[in-house]
From Swiss-Prot:
Its EC number is 6.3.5.-. The keyword Transit peptide applies. Subunit of the heterotrimeric GatCAB amidotransferase (AdT) complex, composed of A, B and C subunits. SUPFAM superfamilies: GatB/YqeY motif, Glutamine synthetase/guanido kinase. It comes from Talaromyces stipitatus (strain ATCC 10500 / CBS 375.48 / QM 6759 / NRRL 1006) (Penicillium stipitatum). This is Glutamyl-tRNA(Gln) amidotransferase subunit B, mitochondrial. InterPro entries: Asn/Gln-tRNA_amidoTrfase_suB/E, Asn/Gln-tRNA_Trfase_suB/E_cat, Asn/Gln_amidotransferase, Asn/Gln_tRNA_amidoTrase-B-like, GatB, GatB_Yqey_C_2, Gln-tRNA_amidoTrfase_suB_CS, Gln_synth/guanido_kin_cat_dom. It is an enzyme of class 6 (ligase). Its main location: mitochondrion.
Length: 595
C-alpha cells in the first residue's frame, strides 16, 4: 500500500510502541553466516530432488485416490447420518498486504532472495527489541471491518512460548488475551457452496481477530537437512477465529473460501491459499445426537465432543477432505468404545486419514504472558470510520449488482466474474460493458437490456476459452476492452455472424493489431445478408434432400433437428452471408407450415 495514503491517518491513530534500543543493519555481513541455519534430521529416506508443482501433485493424488476406490482399497467412509453431530471451528492465518514487517523495519517480500530481508529482531539477536510498524494495522483493520468485527480501542500483545527451528526467539508475539477486533460474523449463502442441509443461508460468528507474526519458511533438502529462510519471520499475520458453529465439511470449506474472497476484495492480503498466503486450522469434534451433552467446551460453547485440531490446511479441498476424514475417524473410535484424544493432527494431499502430530498444547503449555517490550495499541475511532467509509465493494455486494437490472447476469456468470483472477476479470468485463453502453447510447432501453449478458458470455466463455487453450494466465492487454467491445458491437448490429466474430477474436488474440473495422473490411468478413428469396431457395434444397428428417420434425415434433438444418445452411451458403437466426426463422416457416 502506498505510504502517502496511510501517512494521513497515523497522527490520529495514536499508536504507541517502545522504540528500538539498538540500530538495525539489514544484511550485515558479519551476521550472514547466522542467517541460514541447517537443521539435521533423522530421515534416511531418499526423496527426489525435483520439486513437484502443487497442481501436478493434486492431479496425481486425485488419480491415485480414484484408482484405490476402483480397486476396493479406498477408505470406507463412515456415514455422518442423523446419529452423529459434527462441530467445526476454524482458525485462519492470513499474510497481510504490507510493505513492512510487524515488528521490524525490514521489508516484506515473498520472492526476494532467501534471508535478504532480515532485521536483527527477526533473528532474536540479544538486545534487539520489537518496533511496531503502524502501517501494518491498516490492512488488518480493513479485514476486521469487512468481517463485521468490533474494533477494540485498546489491544495488547502477548508472547506465546514454544520452541521450533522456524521461531528463533522461542516465542511468537500474538494477541491472545486482548485482540484488536472481536465479535464479527460472516454470512454464507447457498451460492457460496454451503451444504444442502444448511439451507439457503447460515451465519458463522467470529470470536476474534488478532495480529501476530509469521515464522520462518522451511525448505526441505533431502535426505537429512532443512534450510530456513528468515525473510518470512515477523511478516504480519491476522488470525481469524470462528466460533464452533459449522456442522458440515462443505460449509467449512465455503467459509474459508468466502473469508479469502473478502480479504482479497479489501486488499487486506495479496495472495490466497493457492500461493501460501492463507492457511487454515480446523477443530473437529463429534457427538451422538441422542446422547447427553458432551464434556467438551470450546470458546464458551458447551456440550460438545472432544475436539482435535488439524493444522496447516492449504486448499479449500483439503479443508473439506480433512474434516471428513477426521469426522469418520472419531466416529469409528467412539463406536468401538474408545476415547477421542486431545491432540494435534496433520493431513496430506491425497490422504485418506489424518495422522497424529503431537498431543495438543493448551494455555498452560504455551505460557502466554504480556510482552514487556510492547506498549498497548490504541486505535482511534476516527481512523476506523475513515476506513469504513472507503471500504471497497465486497463480493456479496458485487454479486447483487451483477445480477441486478443494470447488468442482468445469471448467478452462474456473476460468480466467476467476481472470483476469477483476483478481480481482474470483473474489472475487464466492466470496461467492455461501459464501452458497449457508450456505443449503444442512442438505443432504446429494451435494446440495451442484453448488453451485460452478451459481454459476460464473450469475456467468460469465448475469451476465457482462448486463454485456457493457450495455457496462459489472464491478461487484459491481450485483447483490449475497447477492441472486444467493438467486435461485440459488430455482432449485435448484425454486421458479422457469430462464427466470424469468433474467428476475428482468435486473430486478435494471436496478435493481429488491425482495428476491428479495418480487419473485417480487409478480410472481407462483413455480412452481406441474403434476401428472403435466397434464404428460401437454400432452405428448400436442404428440405428436399432430407425428407426423413423433415417428417420426424413434423410428425414427431423433434424440433431440435431444425438446428441441424441451420448448421447446413450456414456451411453451404456463401461465407459470411447466412445469419443463423434468420435461417432458423425461414426453416420453421417452411417445415412447420400447414399444407
Amino acid at each position: 500500500m502506498p505510504r502517502l495514503w496511510y501517512s494521513r491517518y497515523l497522527a490520529s491513530a495514536r499508536l504507541r510502541c517502545r522504540p528500538l534500543l539498538i540500530s538495525e543493519q539489514y544484511g550485515a555481513r558479519i551476521y550472514q553466516h547466522l542467517l541460514r541455519r541447517t537443521i539435521n534430521t533423522e530421515a534416511n529416506v531418499q526423496r527426489p530432488n525435483d520439486i513437484v508443482p502443487l497442481r501436478k501433485q493434486l492431479k496425481e493424488e486425485a488419480k491415485r485416490s480414484k484408482s484405490q476406490s476402483r480397486n476396493g482399497r479406498g477408505k470406507k467412509q463412515v456415514a455422518a447420518n442423523n446419529e452423529w453431530e459434527l462441530t467445526v471451528g476454524i482458525e485462519i492465518h492470513a499474510q497481510l498486504n504490507s510493505e513492512a514487517k510487524l515488528f521490524s523495519r525490514a521489508p516484506t517480500s515473498t520472492v526476494a532472495e532467501p534471508n535478504s530481508n532480515v532485521a536483527l529482531f527477526d533473528l532474536a539477536f540479544p538486545g534487539s527489541q520489537p518496533e511496531f510498524q503502524a502501517a501494518t494495522l491498516l490492512p488488518a483493520l480493513r479485514a476486521a471491518i469487512a468481517l463485521n468485527c468490533e474494533v477494540q480501542h485498546t489491544s495488547r500483545f502477548d508472547r506465546k512460548h514454544y520452541f521450533y527451528q522456524d521461531q528463533p526467539a522461542g516465542y511468537q508475539i500474538t494477541q491472545y488475551y486482548e485482540p484488536f477486533a472481536r465479535n464479527g460474523f460472516i454470512k454464507l449463502y447457498d451460492y457460496d457452496g454451503i451444504a444442502p442441509e444448511d439451507g439457503k443461508f447460515v451465519r458463522i460468528d467470529i470470536k476474534q481477530m488478532q495480529l501476530e507474526q509469521d515464522t520462518a519458511k522451511s525448505h526441505e533438502h533431502p535426505p537429512s537437512a532443512h534450510f530456513l529462510d528468515f525473510n518470512r519471520v515477523s511478516h504480519p499475520l491476522i488470525e481469524i477465529i470462528t466460533m464452533p458453529q459449522i456442522h458440515s465439511p462443505a460449509t467449512a470449506a465455503a467459509c474459508v473460501r468466502k473469508i479469502q474472497a473478502i480479504l482479497q476484495a479489501t486488499s487486506a492480503v495479496t495472495t490466497g491459499m493457492e500461493l501460501g498466503g492463507l492457511r487454515a486450522d480446523v477443530n473437529v469434534s463429534v457427538r451422538r445426537r441422542d446422547a447427553p451433552p458432551g464434556a467438551g467446551e470450546y470458546y464458551g460453547v458447551r456440550g460438545l465432543g472432544q475436539r482435535t485440531e488439524i493444522k496447516n490446511l492449504s486448499s479449500f479441498k483439503a479443508v473439506e477432505d480433512a474434516i471428513i476424514a477426521e469426522r469418520d475417524r472419531q466416529i469409528r473410535v467412539l463406536e468401538s468404545g474408545g476415547t477421542v484424544e486431545v491432540e494435534t493432527r496433520g493431513w496430506s494431499i491425497g490422504s485418506t486419514e489424518t495422522r497424529k502430530l503431537r498431543s495438543k498444547e493448551g494455555e498452560v503449555d504455551y505460557r502466554y504472558m504480556p510482552d514487556p517490550d510492547l506498549h498497548p495499541l490504541f486505535i482511534d475511532d476516527g481512523l476506523v470510520s475513515t476506513l469504513k467509509e472507503n471500504l471497497p465493494t465486497l463480493p456479496d455486494q458485487l454479486l447483487a449488482m451483477l445480477v441486478g437490472p443494470m447488468y442482468g447476469l445469471s448467478l452462474e456468470d456473476a460468480k466467476p466474474l467476481v472470483e476469477l483472477d483476483d478481480g481482474a476479470r470483473l474489472e475487464y468485463y466492466q470496461d467492455v460493458f461501459d464501452v458497449l453502453q457508450a456505443l449503444h447510447s442512442d438505443d432504446r432501453d429494451a435494446a440495451k437490456k442484453g448488453l451485460g449478458r452478451t459481454a459476460a458470455n464473450w469475456v467468460l466463455h469465448e475469451l476465457g476459452a482462448l486463454h485456457t487453450k493457450a495455457e496462459v494466465a489472464w491478461h487484459a492487454d491481450r485483447i483490449p476492452a475497447q477492441t472486444l467491445a467493438e467486435l461485440i458491437d459488430q455482432l449485435i448490429r448484425k454486421k458479422i455472424t457469430s462464427s466470424v466474430a469468433k474467428q476475428v477474436l482468435v486473430m486478435v488474440f494471436e496478435g493481429d493489431q488491425r482495428p476491428i473495422q479495418q480487419l473485417l473490411e480487409e478480410e472481407n468478413l462483413l455480412l452481406r445478408p441474403l434476401c428472403r428469396e435466397e434464404y428460401i431457395a437454400l432452405a428448400n434444397s436442404l428440405i428436399e434432400e432430407n425428407p426423413q428428417m423433415v417428417a420426424q420434425i413434423r410428425e414427431k415434433n423433434q424440433l431440435g433437428k431444425i438446428g441441424w438444418f441451420v448448421g447446413q445452411m450456414v456451411r453451404q451458403g456463401e461465407k459470411g452471408r447466412v445469419e443463423a437466426q434468420r435461417a432458423e426463422e425461414i426453416l420453421r416457416e417452411l417445415i412447420l407450415k400447414r399444407n
